[in-house]
């Protein structure tokens, strides 16, 4: 994936210590709408673009005992849609890391919901937005930077935002995925997964739908359906930490 840079320990963009990853693309919609050169990331845009493996970034994050979240920021993460979703998918599925992911976007909430962003097909973009939210435990900061406004404190992020149109929303897990508590069974299934090239050992067909986590179990997570996946490796359980919210 392509990035502009990494800050291993960032304390200015979220209330928890975070790894910050700067994405490399932007349409500079803030400057266009404000009719001037006001972008706070204009210098970053001039920096060289780096090519890195998403797995290396995730492993780097997981090795740091200080950081508790990952912040994906500017330029504009949603203008790198071919890297944004695969990164979060890899974090959740391959590395089984369910830490909070914070996304800073200059798009509005309505633009993202309606697929009015990027250069793609609106229907595809709407599906992309929903697929993103299905991963859960996300915080998304919305809104353009507008110059000459008073900064305000955002309760969700725990930091100051520059324009009064900007705000963050949390998209929590309704359920959470856990490994089966039977460690012997987990070991056995993981050995079979390895032998099977990552495909579900209880399925005959090998395609994207049967790659662990299989599509059927991902749909169960999406719809907050409790229970085990077919092979028994994962269990979707109620996230009791969200009770009463």
Annotate the PLM regions:
Residues 30, 124-130:
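Short, glycine/polar-rich helix-capping loops at beta-to-alpha or helix-loop-helix junctions
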Residues 35-52, 66-80, 97-123, 133, ...:
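Core AdoMet radical
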Residues 57-76, 230-236, 240-242:
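Short Fe-S-cluster ligation motifs
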Residues 80-88:
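Active-site-adjacent beta->alpha loops and helix N-cap segments on the catalytic face
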Residues 175-245:
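Long, distal/terminal scaffolding or interaction modules
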Residues 166-175:
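Charged phosphate-binding loop/patch that engages nucleotide di/tri-phosphates or the phosphate backbone
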